[in-house]
Amino acid sequence: MAAGAGARPAPRWVKALGEPLSAAQLRRLEDHRYSAAGESLFEPPLQLFWTWLLQWIPLWIAPNTITLFGLAINLFTTLVLIFYCPTVTEEAPYWTYLLCALGLFIYQSLDAIDGKQARRTNSCSPLGELFDHGCDSLSTVFMAIGASIAVRLGTHPDWLFFCSFVGMFMFYCAHWQTYVSGVLRFGRVDVTEIQVALVIVFLLSTFGGAMMWDYTIPILEIKLKILPVLGVVGGLIFSCSNYFHVILHGGVGKNGSTIAGTSVLSPGLHIGLIIILAIMIYKKSATNVFEKHPCLYTLMFGCVFAKVAQKLVIAHMTKSELYLQDTVFIGPGLLFLDQYFNNFIDEYVVLWIAMVITSFDMMIYFSSLCLQISRHLHLSIFKTSYQQAPEQVHKHID
């Protein structure tokens, strides 16, 4: 059956999740084509490995299954590290860092071949693109936490905060410029290079111990752990200069607007609100909630970021306006109100409540979004069928 020929009736439990997209958005989604440009430094040699790896993947395994399996491994290995280092100041057993290096490498490899599997099985679709970016948004949060733990960055709370949120900001900006230009652009130094660098950091902590990052470099008189932080700062400047060059030079819409015909600056409100709330709550906390519970704090705001990033991706795919109002901000709002009323309830308790609210809100939204799209396009999320939608990919190398 052709995509868009009429959605299958939704089961009652699916209807309870809600349907995030309107009929008009679903119609525009049918016309969406994935468009990417650019090639990073490490991509050509790694393509050889990814192509070799693909031949071992059976045709009956769906691309989204590959993506989800990789994400699950990455999340599990990082959660093990968080268990041993909840304040990002502890030193975990050596094998946990090795596990994280392996988990991140597996995630990177599977994330790279899911699209190849989709083209191989003729199952490319907007659903696969959304699912891939949705998983990436969550993985971005966990990678930042894992890397911070590996170098014991909790001894420098301000740098820890910066490194915890800079990855979210850069991921959002990448899709912000896509929303403006209609093309996902990869720089010479991009996510692949970042992931390789993080694998190296995990391996160094495996064989040298996390305490090695406290070594003071002679002459410079700075700790070794500051070097990767400075690398992050350099990456931020380099990447964001490229992103904002695209954003500020006008979009493909009418009068230089976004692909949806809205202001090119409008998506900045969403990531700006997340970062402003995170900074305010961090700095105004009477109980030092971020310093004492940095992993939980980052995960809570990470869930907020993941949902907002997912909304930005689907706004691009459906050529729709991105609205600021969202229930996912209830979690940070509770922390903000608790501080306003002089911590009427213990901040740690409120942080856990916020974590539960934001994580469920994000997962329900993403699940309902995928289910609605799968019904409308007559696709299976975790099954491969040669009768699925035709390939919807356009890629050109600058």
Curated annotation (Swiss-Prot):
CDP-choline binds at N64, R119. It comes from the Eukaryota. Pathway: Phospholipid metabolism; phosphatidylcholine biosynthesis; phosphatidylcholine from phosphocholine: step 2/2. The modification N-acetylalanine is found at A2. It comes from Rattus norvegicus. Keywords: Acetylation, Golgi apparatus, Lipid biosynthesis, Lipid metabolism, Magnesium, Manganese, Membrane, Metal-binding, Phospholipid biosynthesis, Phospholipid metabolism, Transferase, Transmembrane, Transmembrane helix. The record marks E129 as: Increases basicity of active site His. Belongs to the CDP-alcohol phosphatidyltransferase class-I family. Its EC number is 2.7.8.2. Mg(2+) 1 binds at D111, D114, D132. GO terms for molecular function: diacylglycerol cholinephosphotransferase activity; metal ion binding; phosphotransferase activity, for other substituted phosphate groups. PROSITE patterns: CDP_ALCOHOL_P_TRANSF. It catalyses: CDP-choline + a 1,2-diacyl-sn-glycerol = a 1,2-diacyl-sn-glycero-3-phosphocholine + CMP + H(+); 1-octadecanoyl-2-(5Z,8Z,11Z,14Z-eicosatetraenoyl)-sn-glycerol + CDP-choline = 1-octadecanoyl-2-(5Z,8Z,11Z,14Z-eicosatetraenoyl)-sn-glycero-3-phosphocholine + CMP + H(+); 1-hexadecanoyl-2-(9Z-octadecenoyl)-sn-glycerol + CDP-choline = 1-hexadecanoyl-2-(9Z-octadecenoyl)-sn-glycero-3-phosphocholine + CMP + H(+); 1-hexadecanoyl-2-(4Z,7Z,10Z,13Z,16Z,19Z-docosahexaenoyl)-sn-glycerol + CDP-choline = 1-hexadecanoyl-2-(4Z,7Z,10Z,13Z,16Z,19Z-docosahexaenoyl)-sn-glycero-3-phosphocholine + CMP + H(+). This is Cholinephosphotransferase 1. PANTHER family: CHOLINEPHOSPHOTRANSFERASE 1, ETHANOLAMINEPHOSPHOTRANSFERASE. Catalyzes the final step of de novo phosphatidylcholine (PC) synthesis, i.e. the transfer of choline phosphate from CDP-choline to the free hydroxyl of a diacylglycerol (DAG), producing a PC. It thereby plays a central role in the formation and maintenance of vesicular membranes. One of its GO terms (cellular component) is endoplasmic reticulum membrane. Residues 84-93, 151-160, 208-222, 282-293, 340-346 are lumenal. The gene is Chpt1. It is a multi-pass membrane protein. The active site is at H133 (proton acceptor). InterPro entries: CDP-OH_P_trans, CDP-OH_PTrfase_TM_dom, CDP_ALCOHOL_P_TRANSF_CS, CHOPT.
